[in-house]
Amino acid sequence: MTQSHLILPMMLVIPLIGAALIFMIKPGASGHRARGLGVLAFCFALIPALMGVVLLTRFNYAAGSVWQQRFNYPWLPQFHVNFSFGVDAISLWLLMLTLLVTPMAILDAVNKIQHRQNEFYAWMLISYACMIGVFISHDVLLFYLFFEFSLIPTFFILGIWGHSDRRKAAVKFFLYAFAGSVLLLASLIYLALVHQEKFGTFSFALADLYRAGQALSPTQQGIVFLGLLIGFAIKVPLFPVHTWMPLAITESPTPGSVMIALVKLGAYGLLRFAIPMLPLAAVRFTPFLAVLCVISILYGGLISWVQRDMKKLIAYSVLSHLGLCILALLALTMTGLTGCVLVMLSSGLLAAAMLMVMGMIYRRYHTRNLLEISGLARRLPVLGFFAVFFFMGTAALPGLIGFISEIISLVGTYVSGSAGHGGYLGPAYAIPAALGMILGALYMLYWVAHVIFGPLVETVPDADTSSTHAPAVVQDLSVREWLVLLPLALAVLFLGLYPAPVLNSLQPAIGKIRHEVLAAVQENATSRMAVNTHRVGAVHSAGKPGLVAPLESQGLGKAVALRLPVRLAR
């Protein structure tokens, strides 16, 4: 085992060590000690990020479909469960997103958490480790454990350090997540049992569960896919199982809101597991899911128009963009699948950045009501600039990552089903999705015009009373806040102007998943066609030409044989 193979488990272990160490340090009454805990947590979060830079230099981008930097250590060998880690191009870029944003979220929290600071930073680091574990896991059971353990720190961060309605938000979040977890675990265990029955070993290895899922009949695939779908759709979230997210984002402290909006675990689970494992069911459910995606896009955009709470505005914007993400995934074109991953990256970056900007505004104005904030560019020009920058990124301004991700996703959906592209959607889904994105851009422009460039508001609500007062001194960005926002802005700009490294590295990994899905669908169609042809031939050879000849004379014999495959392809 070479040293390079240890980089992924080290990324996972270092935040956990930091969490254990910080948890044992009592914050005390001194503000300096609390600040020191935040800085220490930031350092433990920064180390894996620096290791991520090393990983970027060692990754073979031409072989993006190959799991690289593999680490494998037996855990439960009798069940073929291992500590198996690795990254391909898809998981690499989502891992980089996590490694960039989480340290910034922790740094943003320094001096802002007023009680039980050691516990807060410990939970943030545990959440960080869980997200890293999700994206580097090559064993499906290991993925599931990290996927579900990520709920625990989010629950405590929301329930302890959230706002006035935090307990309701935490309970609702937990109930939704727990319901999805049960279905998800049952589906994965069933696939492992199928692999034991058909291939002789009980295994949670990724390749083995792919093989087990694809060996199921279309009906069996549909039942298992439904369990995976509900589990992952709750975490996306997708309409109509989205209602936990706006409340959770609104009631969480800013770092907790960032972690909720950042992670794209549900979308990643659908892309990595549900669709390639159960391709026949995925194709069968595609029209239904695509309609839900379009509803998510339009619903999120329309609800955002009437929002006055800054955090709720961002939450419904995230819902709209994730609807586009899953729609592009369902298109099953190379362009659409690439757009799906790009939307995960852009939504994570932009939503996290906007939430941090909104948190900085809240700390100065003590309100989240957008109608009570205006003229930000005059009083806080630097913060106003970053607010405009990230708002415009979300509105898909050309040159920023939001634009390239939305365009690629919409084009991939539009050409889906046309000659030479494959897929099962088309303009009927792409056009309303595009209208939803335009709607989103319009409400972002509206709030930029009002909040940033509107008339200067001199009175703001007091944090503790119902009266209003003119804030004595409203300072622009501090050095720490510059350090939080600048890396995110540079990433949004760089990926918008030069997305080629991401796009090129994704092609092999995306192509591999797409090939597995379409090959399984084609194989099923071919086998069903052969069965139907055999049945027609058997009827003819049995001396009953009257049942066949009229069909052949009308040119319909082939259509009867191909009826199921044609319906499936559509």
List where the protein language model places each region.
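Transmembrane helix-loop-helix hairpins at membrane boundaries of multipass inner-membrane proteins
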Residues: 1-7, 21-122, 198-211, 540, ...
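Central hydrophobic cores of alpha-helical transmembrane segments in multi-pass inner-membrane proteins
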Residues: 9-27, 42-55, 95-109, 127-129, ...
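Alpha-helical transmembrane segments and their helix-start/interface "positive-inside/aromatic belt" motifs
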Residues: 33-46, 168-180, 380-385, 479-487
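C-terminal TM-helix exit segments that contain a strictly Trp-centered aromatic cap at the helix terminus
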Residues: 49-60, 185-193, 397, 495, ...
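Membrane-interface helix-loop-helix modules in multi-pass inner-membrane proteins
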Residues: 66-95, 140-143, 147-155, 232, ...
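Membrane-interfacial helical/loop segments at transmembrane boundaries in membrane proteins
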Residues: 67-76, 200-212, 412, 416-421, ...
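Hydrophobic transmembrane alpha-helices and their helix-loop junctions in integral membrane proteins
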Residues: 104-112, 129-141, 155-449
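Cytoplasmic/organellar membrane-interface segments at the starts of transmembrane helices
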Residues: 378-382, 444-540, 544-549, 555-570
